[in-house]
A protein has these predicted regions:
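Active-site proximal loops enriched in glycine and acidic residues that flank catalytic Cys/His/Asp
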Residues: 72, 112, 133-135, 163-165, ...
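C-terminal cap of metal-dependent C-N hydrolases
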Residues: 285-292, 309-311, 361-407, 411-413
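Active-site neighborhoods of metal-dependent hydrolases
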Residues: 19, 25-35, 43-47, 53-94, ...
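Divalent metal-coordination and catalytic microenvironments
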Residues: 22, 64, 162, 251, ...
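Core domains of carbohydrate- and sulfate-ester-processing enzymes
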Residues: 2-7
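Active-site lining segments that contact anionic ligands and/or coordinate catalytic metals
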Residues: 126-128, 156-160, 223, 289-292, ...
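Acidic, glycine-enriched loop/beta-strand segments at the rims
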Residues: 269-283, 327-332, 340-374
């Protein structure tokens, strides 16, 4: 690394000449560890340390951060297994930081914070809050969650939620992760893709795989929440039958269904554990609220487990073209002008003279996301998912064509957007 402070980090990003425009939030974990060292994991900050953190965040804002982010979601761990710094920080620590973010029209972004913490922050110096949200998927849960969001915004609070557009959580299949622990499955796991495909076409080997999958506790995934993404060009995110139901209909053990669908798709078939946004009808009811924007998803994290890059294409295909939850202008506003306003970008988000020319040209009748696929192009040939789309003619970044007919050009016209 060639940076210490946040502004130097943004300088480094500029030197990389990004293809897209990027903006950043200064992270709580890094700031807390910088101030408190190893104590940052499980101890509370002193008043002096809280002030030091606020000073660092204030400098980051002056150097271009659009806000501050914190994560209170316990399953997010450091390499040694401890919850990341900031997970258990007192609310007063976040309030102290909000005192320097709010007056600069910065954004306080939270993951895993309860409603009272968010209200306290939103009531500090006029702070704007963005947080990750969703609904359980049970009947009526979308409307219930939307009403709760309305209640959080009472008394002048400015709290915006963001949520997935379709089921997400963990994707697996023959080309990526395998769902069973066992010696034969470990043998399959050790093979490359061609070797795996050959192995699952061997009857004796498959019988051994199924026998291990029948063992109690061989699979830790809740299979009643796992859905096959189908054989079509576009992934099927609205299928009603989970993997257990598919196997019962076929008179098979679920592992037999997994292996059969893998063979029939020539190993390319993927299975999606819908941890979040498993019910699209309820998600649509949640999206009815103006203070909720679509877009929560992993693209650059969990790169061999999740691929949410197609969420915006799905927004246009499912919620506009197929179900009519949104009109086309409404959906575009939700994905452009609204997020720009939440982030605090005043020079983009609408097609208007004098605004930045960040434009997508697409066919509303054709736009759709395509099936994710695994490639090995990371350092050391490490794997990651990629995902393409159909129906986009061009993506224009700062007036220059960045993507044409679905393929990147050599233009790298992106900028680091500073607050």
């Amino acid at each position: 690394w060639n940076w210490e402070h946040y502004g130097q980090y943004l300088d480094t990003l500029e030197e990389l000449k990004p293809s897209l425009n990027v903006a950043g939030l200064v992270g709580h974990s890094a700031v807390r560890y910088y101030v408190m060292g190893d104590r940052s994991f499980d101890q509370q900050a002193t008043e002096a340390e809280k002030q030091q953190m606020a000073d660092i965040v204030e400098k980051a804002m002056k150097d271009g951060a659009v806000g501050f982010s914190t994560n209170r979601y316990e399953p997010h761990k450091a390499p040694d297994g401890r919850a990341i710094p900031g997970t258990y920080a007192e609310c007063s620590e976040l309030v102290e930081i909000a005192k320097v973010v709010g007056p600069r029209d910065g954004l306080m972004q939270l993951v895993g914070a309860d409603a009272e913490v968010m209200k306290s922050i939103a009531e500090t110096e006029g702070s704007r809050v963005l947080f990750s949200y969703g609904c359980s998927g049970e009947e009526g849960s979308g409307t219930k969650a939307a009403t709760h969001l309305d209640e959080m915004n009472l008394e002048g609070r400015n709290i915006t939620a963001t949520s997935h557009t379709r089921g997400s959580g963990y994707m697996f299949g023959l080309q990526s992760g395998l769902p069973v622990e066992g010696l034969t499955w470990d043998e399959l796991r050790a093979k490359d893709f061609a070797g795996r495909l050959e192995a699952i076409n061997d009857e004796t080997f498959c019988n051994a795989l199924v026998a291990e999958a029948r063992e109690p506790k061989s699979c830790g995934i809740p299979l009643q929440k796992v859905y096959f993404l189908g054989f079509d060009e576009a992934p099927e995110h609205n299928s009603a039958q989970n993997l257990i139901e598919l196997s019962k209909c076929a008179g098979e053990h679920w592992s037999e269904t997994f292996l059969r669908l893998s063979r029939e798709s020539k190993g390319r078939g993927l299975f999606n554990w819908r941890m979040f946004a498993g019910n699209l009808k309820e998600q649509g009811d949640l999206f009815a609220r103006e203070n909720l924007i679509p877009g929560l998803g992993d693209v650059g994290a969990h790169v061999s487990q999740i691929m949410d890059g197609g969420w915006s294409s799905f927004m246009l295909s499912h919620y506009v073209r197929e179900t009519g939850v949104f009109t086309l202008p409404e959906a575009i506003k939700r994905m452009t002008a609204d997020p720009a306003a939440v982030i605090g970008l005043k020079d983009r988000g609408v097609l208007k003279t004098g605004m930045k020319a960040d434009i997508n040209v697409f066919s509303p009748d054709e736009v759709t996301e395509l099936q994710p696929e695994l490639v090995n192009d990371f350092p050391g040939d490490a794997p990651r998912y990629i995902q393409k789309s159909r129906g986009f003619k061009a993506t224009i970044v700062n007036g220059q064509v960045n993507v044409l007919d679905g393929e990147p050009t050599k233009v790298r016209a992106g900028q680091v957007l500073r607050h």
